[in-house]
Regions:
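Core catalytic region of metal-dependent phosphoesterases/phosphodiesterases
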Residues: 2-5, 9, 14-114
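Conserved catalytic motifs of the protein kinase core domain
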Residues: 5, 43, 117, 200, ...
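Residue-level detector of flexible, active-site-proximal loop/helix-junction positions
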Residues: 13, 112, 228, 240, ...
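Active-site environment of divalent metal-dependent phosphoester hydrolases
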Residues: 15-17, 52-55, 85-95, 127-129, ...
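Conserved beta-sheet core of the metallophosphoesterase superfamily
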Residues: 104-107, 120, 125, 131-139, ...
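Structural motif
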Residues: 114-115, 237
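Active-site-proximal loop/helix segment associated with metal-binding centers of metalloenzymes
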Residues: 124-185
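C-terminal regulatory/interaction regions
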Residues: 248-258
Length: 258
């Protein structure tokens, strides 16, 4: 990989103001991280919930995020592939980002191989057994008829409503989350998957709890954390996965490695 790294981040929730800063301040911070990452990145994976709410019409998209869009376009134009994954907050990405920014858009988990190591990469929501209420909600959100009906609403109302719902959903739950180990549904999903196929790493967002957790058969589960409370990301350096906390203008803090 010629000393280049693969970068992973998720759950940035752009557009969401928090106790640690305005939405614009967090966007600027993430753009600063992108500036650092592009120096030695071979690829960048943004693994879902990039936006706190996103819904694009055929000819209308939400305003804002100008700095973020500009930097992503610049990185793609420089020859570094950038991958966007839909999450549960931005499931309504369609063709705007591939056409305008040149990113690769993924609606489902993908499998990639880096230096002979197989990676299973996705946002992580709705995988495995259980959580049937959320799975039903996701089916509703991805239903093409219901999407068409929602698109009949004027953007002034639909985007206001979507943002209000998203913020309410976020603050109705704990933003921070403590990972529960093998009892987590996502860990159970990964271990069950390993019964049928070998992987070295499962890389997910969604849980907002940065951790590298050991699985069966020497595999690892990497949960990327978030950019609301933790400001974390992961890199694959060709040998190991590194989970780090971004600290602007300082050396980033290594949280875990494996």
């Amino acid at each position: 990989m010629n000393n280049q790294k693969v970068y992973f981040a998720s759950d940035i929730h752009l557009g969401l103001p928090t106790q640690k800063g305005s939405a614009l301040a967090r966007e600027k911070l993430f753009v600063k991280w992108l500036d650092e990452a592009k120096k030695d990145a071979s690829e960048i994976f943004l693994v879902g919930d990039i936006f706190d709410f996103w819904y694009e019409y055929k000819r209308v998209v939400p305003k804002g995020f100008t700095r973020f869009f500009g930097r992503i376009a610049e990185i793609v134009d420089s020859g570094i592939p950038v991958h966007f994954f839909t999450g549960n907050h931005d499931v309504w990405m369609f063709d705007y980002f591939p056409k305008e920014l040149g990113v690769e858009l993924h609606r489902k988990p993908i499998v990639r191989v880096f230096n002979g190591k197989k990676f299973f990469i996705g946002h992580g929501d709705g995988l495995g057994k259980g959580d049937y209420g959320y799975k039903l909600l996701k089916l509703i959100f991805t239903n093409r008829v219901l999407q068409w009906l929602f698109s009949r609403l004027h953007p002034n109302f639909s985007l206001w409503f979507g943002n209000r719902w998203s913020v309410s959903s976020r603050y109705s739950k704990y933003i921070t989350y403590k990972f529960k180990g093998d009892s987590e549904l996502i860990a159970q999903f990964a271990n069950t998957t390993l019964d049928d196929e070998m992987y070295s790493y499962f890389v997910f967002g969604h849980w907002h709890a940065p951790v590298i957790h050991p699985l069966k058969n020497s595999a690892k589960l990497v949960v990327l954390g978030d950019w609301i409370e933790n400001f974390t990301y992961a890199t694959w350096d060709g040998e190991l996965m590194n989970l780090l906390r971004y600290i602007p203008n300082e050396n980033d803090e290594l949280l875990a490695q494996g």
